[in-house]
């Protein structure tokens, strides 16, 4: 039986020499007989078909390799070179027998005492990275910034599970690292749009080829040009006279009546180019390192080169490209169209540089007149052409400004190449607007357009568009058109989002075919001249790799796939509840008694007690109550008083989705202190069994119950690290930000923490508002401290380990998040005497574009439990892709887990098993979800906080003065309303 090893932070083994790296010395370059780390045959055993091993030489090479490994771990040095007859002719291990992970040696060689030395040494090396200051400054712990290194992979990948062969949408990029690249800075005046800038570059290449040494350079459309050869001079200046198509059309109340013949206006541009740097891609390793990424500037240059061809032919939005030539363009309503495109990104992987290519769908503004656009976008303006004299109320004006702000338009009353950005609306209606001319004489805007352009403005009572941030500059709405190629701003409606989702909901074989077509098509990254000129070769075949399918855990539920005969593991008792009907026809309202009966029966069947009678008769309210906050609050208080201020639940049946939903939640959870469950009349009228079951499960989860539990507790799955008597807390964190172009609303951070062990399926949450678009969680130390307090109250112990899952962090923010948020967690722990738990900090990424496809021809999604941690993952750091859910529609998207810090020293198998098992513990579902529950709960809680903020700010209104477009000073952070004590420890956000 293995000896228990307690992983305390202060544990050290002074007789073991320290090392600069956790990487075994054997894997560092050493003369001629040791492989560099990671040995490619260990990472990609299936890819080596020509091992050329001599049978007689295999055993000696094999055992010498293990001898080197244990010698290096015990002596902290390498053994002397072996005799010549023991030198391996090729990789010394058989292709399917990888080296055991370092700190799991006890499972393979229990008789070797060196295994304990290896484990303790690695524990010491990992934990010494944090230096705890004895002098507490401002209540925080000092963490040496230089010591914070992102966790390295602890082994060569997991071994558990059955093998599955997969294709990944990563395409290998081969390049000549000695190829020199010349970087030039470009300045164009007057400053053009991206489209015009590319036209300028194209004309220069055609007319002045000698200046560019006969090559076609790559241009990012802004200020950077990359060339495979040096131009004729370090500084170049050109003057380009470019004929630019003008925009003019005759308007008929917002619709194009006829398009004028397109004319071209000559415009002169000055182009200055300056050589900034020249570099190549040779690896720049630091002394003692066996791997280093390519220089960032080289990666950026390669990325621009590979984007050159699609940028010439498509509209680029971020890292994605869209074109109507790809098909799939579809109106989605509300003045928007869905457009199909593709995403591409260059990534460092274990197999080398790879191009991640995927299908992308997004919404664009429809290129129509502003009046026609508003008719489609805003329901209250559908009759605008028939009611030209209509004025806007203050609320309607606010909605119009919200719909148009930051959209680019062009005018249709004159020839022009100019585009304008909408910054707001005028205070006055068009009829009342006057403006000064160059001589200071005031002119009436309507008279000006009639005298100069012969156009009589029709919509006199609408405001004008304000098209300058700094000074008054107005355009009548009816004379403006929406420019093409603009991504839809703001939040899509539920109907629009559903249509976009449907456009992107391709079966795996369909998605794969689209990606393959892009790679071989004319808009693909390898179809232009740049790849040839820069000596690049992009594979047109997806990456073949081996994944593994993990075994699902057994649950404490008889039939997890059939709710008809199953009961929840923990059912709650709901004795005091009420029902509130908001809106609805008389026929819909008549279904309420049947709905109550069906719901109570279903709850009883599931093991949830819901009293068959509400505390009072149903409260029927008109739908406009959701528009009146004070009236809504008064009614909710009345319902609470009817229950003697002891209500557990209010079920709210609504006629349709309404923005007042946010007010209902905020008032109920912060002012009244009661959990609510909302549903729609169309659903309760149909009253399907599945709908009622899901509703009952949500209610049970919110009031304190849970659907299921792991049959074998979490510690039993990882006995090396976890024990029932040493509790562990699982935490999740997320930050939500305002919609694009909202430049003042605060961001909302949420942190959740488990409060039971070893079940670990009940969570409490904490939410805070913070600085506008601040990704780092500012009050993390306070929230973690509160969650640890809650854990202690529930479990009577502080957790020995903290497993922290952080959602919503991009790769560029990894080090900053690790540095600041790990410090915050440590600071929270320091508030407790002699408390120093082991911490694992993992980032959870769902918004990525890696997709995995089966190799077999059945075209189904990959099965739940599919994990990949080789070939397409990071070359050195600890990450893996896990598809934990069953993909029913579209193509499954695996979740990417990247471990930034690991004092618990998980092996790949252990952490993957833990995450997969946790995905079965979601509180209101019997099937595994796609993302680890703590991260998902944090996302839901942050969204709830965002709802509070948005409704509060909308209720307070805003200034319509165009001068307010230029905000002075930093935006104020609106504090979140405090949760009621009755609600804050419940999972009300589920």
From Swiss-Prot:
It holds the Pfam family Piwi. SMART domains: DUF1785, PAZ, Piwi. Expressed in leaves and floral buds, and at low levels in roots. Residues 379-484 form the PAZ domain. One of its GO terms (cellular component) is cytoplasmic ribonucleoprotein granule. GO terms for molecular function: RNA binding. Residues 1-25, 953-973 are annotated as: Disordered. Disruption phenotype: First leaves are elongated and curl downward. Increased number of hydathodes per leaf. Accelerated appearance of abaxial trichomes. Presence of stigmatic tissue in the middle of the septum at the apical end of the carpels. One of its GO terms (biological process) is ta-siRNA processing. Residues 649-950 form the Piwi domain. PANTHER family: EUKARYOTIC TRANSLATION INITIATION FACTOR 2C. Involved in RNA-mediated post-transcriptional gene silencing (PTGS). Main component of the RNA-induced silencing complex (RISC) that binds to a short guide RNA such as a microRNA (miRNA) or small interfering RNA (siRNA). RISC uses the mature miRNA or siRNA as a guide for slicer-directed cleavage of homologous mRNAs to repress gene expression. Required for the processing of 21 nucleotide trans-acting siRNAs (ta-siRNAs) derived from TAS3a transcripts. Associates preferentially with the microRNA (miRNA) miR390 which guides the cleavage of TAS3 precursor RNA. This is Protein argonaute 7. It comes from Arabidopsis thaliana (Mouse-ear cress). The lineage of its organism: Eukaryota, Viridiplantae, Streptophyta, Embryophyta, Tracheophyta.
């Amino acid at each position: 039986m293995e000896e228990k090893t307690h992983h305390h932070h202060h544990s050290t083994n002074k007789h073991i020499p320290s090392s600069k790296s956790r990487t075994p010395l054997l894997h560092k370059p050493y003369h001629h007989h040791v492989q560099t780390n990671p040995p490619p045959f260990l990472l990609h055993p299936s890819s080596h078909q020509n091992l050329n091993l001599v049978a007689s030489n295999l055993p000696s090479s094999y055992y010498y390799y293990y001898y080197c490994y244990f010698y290096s771990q015990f002596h902290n040095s390498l053994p002397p070179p072996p005799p010549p007859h023991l030198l391996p002719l090729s990789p010394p291990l058989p292709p399917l027998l990888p080296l055991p992970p370092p700190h799991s040696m006890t499972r393979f060689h229990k008789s070797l005492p060196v295994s304990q030395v290896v484990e303790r040494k690695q524990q010491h090396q990992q934990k010494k990275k944090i230096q705890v200051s004895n002098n507490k400054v401002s209540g925080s712990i000092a963490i040496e910034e230089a010591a914070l290194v992102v966790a390295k992979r602890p082994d060569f990948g997991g071994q558990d599970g059955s093998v599955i062969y997969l294709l990944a949408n990563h395409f290998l990029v081969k390049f000549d690292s000695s190829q020199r690249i010349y970087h030039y800075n470009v300045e164009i005046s007057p400053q053009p749009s991206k489209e015009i800038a590319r036209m300028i570059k194209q004309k220069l290449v055609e007319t002045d080829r000698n200046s560019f040494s006969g090559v076609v350079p790559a241009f990012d459309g802004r200020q950077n040009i990359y060339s495979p050869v040096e131009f004729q001079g370090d500084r170049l200046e050109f003057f380009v006279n470019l004929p630019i198509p003008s925009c003019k059309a005759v308007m008929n109340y917002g619709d194009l009546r006829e398009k004028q013949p397109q004319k071209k206006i000559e415009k002169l541009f000055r182009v200055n180019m300056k050589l900034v740097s020249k570099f190549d891609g040779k690896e720049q390793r630091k002394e003692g390192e066996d791997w280093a990424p390519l220089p960032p500037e080289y990666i950026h240059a390669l990325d621009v080169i590979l984007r050159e061809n699609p940028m010439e032919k498509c509209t680029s939005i971020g890292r994605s490209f869209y074109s109507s030539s790809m098909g799939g363009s579809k109106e989605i309503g509300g003045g928007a169209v869905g457009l199909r495109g593709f995403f591409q990104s260059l990534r460092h992987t274990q197999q080398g540089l790879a191009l991640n290519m995927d299908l992308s769908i997004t919404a664009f503004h429809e290129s129509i007149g502003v009046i026609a656009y508003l008719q489609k976008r805003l329901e209250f303006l559908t009759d605008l052409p028939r009611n030209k004299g209509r004025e806007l109320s203050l609320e309607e004006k606010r909605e119009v400004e919200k719909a148009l702000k930051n959209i680019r338009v062009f005018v249709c009353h004159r020839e022009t190449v100019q585009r304008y950005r909408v910054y707001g609306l005028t205070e006055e209606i068009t009829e009342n607007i006057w403006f000064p001319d160059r001589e200071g004489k005031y002119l009436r805007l309507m008279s000006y357009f009639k005298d100069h352009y012969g156009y009589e403005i029709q919509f006199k009572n609408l405001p004008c568009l304000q098209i300058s941030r700094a000074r008054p500059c107005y355009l009548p709405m009816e004379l403006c058109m929406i420019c093409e190629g603009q991504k839809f701003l703001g939040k899509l409606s539920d109907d629009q989002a559903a249509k976009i989702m449907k456009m992107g909901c391709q079966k795996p074989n369909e998605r794969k075919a689209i990606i393959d077509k892009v790679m071989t098509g004319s808009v693909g990254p390898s179809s232009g001249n740049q790849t040839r000129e820069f000596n690049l070769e992009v594979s047109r075949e997806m990456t073949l790799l081996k994944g593994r399918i993990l075994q699902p855990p057994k649950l404490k539920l008889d039939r997890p796939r059939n709710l008809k005969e199953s009961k929840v593991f923990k059912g709650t008792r709901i004795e005091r509840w009420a029902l509130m009907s908001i809106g609805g026809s008389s026929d819909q309202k008549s279904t309420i008694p049947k709905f109550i009966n069906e719901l109570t029966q279903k709850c009883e069947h599931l093991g949830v007690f819901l009293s068959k009678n509400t505390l009072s008769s149903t409260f029927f309210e008109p739908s406009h109550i959701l528009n009146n906050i004070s009236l809504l609050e008064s009614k909710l208080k009345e319902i609470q008083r009817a229950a003697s201020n002891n209500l557990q639940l209010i079920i709210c049946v609504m006629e349709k989705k309404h923005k007042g939903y946010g007010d209902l939640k905020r008032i109920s959870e912060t002012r009244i202190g009661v959990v609510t469950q909302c549903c729609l009349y169309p659903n309760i009228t149909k009253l399907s069994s599945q709908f009622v079951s899901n509703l009952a499960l949500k209610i049970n989860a919110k009031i304190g119950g849970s659907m299921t539990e792991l049959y074998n507790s979490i510690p039993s799955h990882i006995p090396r690290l976890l024990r029932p008597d040493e509790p562990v807390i699982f935490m999740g964190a997320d930050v939500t930000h305002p919609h694009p172009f909202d430049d003042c609303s605060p961001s909302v951070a949420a942190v959740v923490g488990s409060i039971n062990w070893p079940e670990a399926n009940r969570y409490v949450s904490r939410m805070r508002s913070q600085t506008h678009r601040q990704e780092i969680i500012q009050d993390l130390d306070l929230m973690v401290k509160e969650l640890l307090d809650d854990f202690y109250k529930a479990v009577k112990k502080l957790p020995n380990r903290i497993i922290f899952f952080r959602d919503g962090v991009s790769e560029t923010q990894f080090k900053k998040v690790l540095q600041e948020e790990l410090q915050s967690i440590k600071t929270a722990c320091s508030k407790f005497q002699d408390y120093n738990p082991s911490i694992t900090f993992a980032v959870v990424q769902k918004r990525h574009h890696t997709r995995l496809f089966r190799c077999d021809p059945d075209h189904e999604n990959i099965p739940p439990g599919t994990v990949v941690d080789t070939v397409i993952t990071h070359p050195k750091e600890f990450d893996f892709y896990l598809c934990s859910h069953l993909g029913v529609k579209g193509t499954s998207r695996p979740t990417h887990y990247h471990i930034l810090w690991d004092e618990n020293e998980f092996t790949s198998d252990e952490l993957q098993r833990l995450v997969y098992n946790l995905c079965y513990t979601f509180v209101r579902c019997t099937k595994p979800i796609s993302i680890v529950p703590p991260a998902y709960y944090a996302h839901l809680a942050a969204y709830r906080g965002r709802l509070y903020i948005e409704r509060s700010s909308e209720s307070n209104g805003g200034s319509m003065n165009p001068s307010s477009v230029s905000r002075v000073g930093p935006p104020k952070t609106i504090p979140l309303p405090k949760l009621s004590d009755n609600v804050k420890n419940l999972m009300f956000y589920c």
